[in-house]
A protein has these predicted regions:
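Conserved, single-site charged/polar hotspot
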Residues: 2-6, 10-396
């Protein structure tokens, strides 16, 4: 499983640039149409919509050795450098920059951007196999086909070249070279997320069926199964308000979290994020939980009406608040969105007066597939193959 990847490089908003500035320490070859020229080592090349070379169509940049710096973007690593080749094209909306690179080199800049390079090697190997599998399922993606690319370099697909390469993540990619996860002979889309609450869920969270994705199973992550039916509100309430030291994510910051919002804060935040004004919120009721306990349908009643929020992403956006402290296992923080929908909502009262709501939850992310923090804990005593089999049942 070795192929080339073509990805659009994004700025903070989209894939279009008003100006694109490149530099290579070794110099580079610039191909325009049937002609080409070379730049001196360290020489800067600037493209804007008036650049005459665009008259010949797509412009290709090839480093003489090493990589090319793209000075028009800023990443966690500062100014990023790209291996492989770079293609620069002009469209009505602006300049589009596409990086073409071999998949193994691509992964060496994805894995440290998606998982801390200080994690245990077996966990990093899991991430490498997951990232490679995910990348192959996206080869058929036509999202950016109009621009000569499969994907972009953002969280919408997989984060690429945002954190520095590390020896540990390079080793993880090399030691799993070419390996992907398959189910019945087909490469699977390996969803993963940061932290579990002690329970995973399955694709019913996103309205799909388990028949289509049988390798995603809602199950206990490490601890003893407490025999609770987590789709039942009262039993999930018991689960999320308890902790289990045997859970692989137990020591993680967002294994459990809670926040308290006043009626004013939660009502204004809800109206702002959903565009639905129900007035002052009087009641929040979870109408449906999927396997594993994640909420997918929440009824909100206010003094001006009621509405139902019916998707995981919408629920997380509707009740998060960047202006309110969230209590975690390692202090307080703030989030614009809820970390997950593995949560319960409770009224806060003074006497008989409703003053606010407390949200108690666990985990960070959607909860489908592999918990990265759990994988790191499991890697202390398990191989990457064993960890992957745990999170992606029946895959090889």
């Amino acid at each position: 499983y070795r192929r080339q990847r073509q990805m659009c490089i994004r700025d903070s908003r989209d894939i279009f640039f008003n100006e694109a500035v490149f530099c290579a320490d070794s110099g580079m070859i610039v191909e325009t149409g049937e002609e080409s020229y070379e730049t001196a080592p360290g020489e800067t090349v600037v493209f804007n919509p008036d650049t005459e070379d665009f008259n010949e169509g797509r412009i290709k940049l090839i480093p003489k050795s090493g990589e090319i710096q793209f000075q028009s973007v800023n990443r966690g690593i500062g100014t990023p450098s790209y291996g492989g080749t770079i293609e620069v094209s002009l469209y009505d909306e602006g300049i589009v920059v596409v990086n073409e690179v071999g998949i193994e080199d691509y992964l060496k800049k994805v894995v440290p951007s998606e998982m801390p390079s200080g994690f245990n090697l077996e966990a990093l190997k899991c991430q490498a196999v997951c990232a490679r599998s995910y990348a192959y399922t996206e080869l058929s993606n036509n999202y950016y086909s109009a621009y000569g690319a499969h994907i972009d370099d953002s969280i919408q697909f997989q984060v690429y070249n945002n954190s520095p390469r590390a020896e540990s993540t390079d080793t993880a990619v090399d030691e799993t070279a070419g390996q992907v996860l398959s189910y019945n002979g087909e490469v699977v889309k390996t969803y993963y997320y940061s932290t579990s609450c002690g329970s995973t869920t399955d694709v019913t969270l996103w309205g799909n069926t388990t028949e289509n994705y049988p390798y995603f199973v809602a199950e206990c992550v490490g601890g003893v199964d407490r025999g609770l039916t987590l789709t039942v509100e009262s039993e999930f309430n018991t689960f999320i308000k308890g902790e289990n030291e045997a859970d692989y994510d137990y020591d993680c910051t967002l294994y459990r979290w809670s926040m308290e919002e006043s009626v004013k804060e939660i009502s204004e935040g809800f109206a702002r994020s959903t565009g639905k004004n129900v007035g002052n919120i009087k009641d929040i009721e979870v109408l449906e939980r999927v396997n594993g306990g994640a909420a997918v349908k929440v009824k909100v009643t206010g003094d001006k009406g009621e509405t139902v929020i019916d998707s995981e992403s919408a629920i997380r956006a509707a009740f998060g608040n960047a202006n309110v402290d969230m209590n975690t296992k390692s202090g307080t923080t703030r989030y614009a969105n809820l970390p997950s929908t593995f949560c319960v909502f409770e009224k806060v009262t003074e006497g008989k007066k409703l003053t606010g709501f407390k949200i108690t939850g666990g985990g960070y992310g959607h909860g489908i597939g592999m918990s990265q923090n759990a994988a790191n804990k499991m890697a202390e005593s398990m191989t990457y193959a064993q960890i992957l089999e745990f999170f992606y049942r029946g895959t090889t």
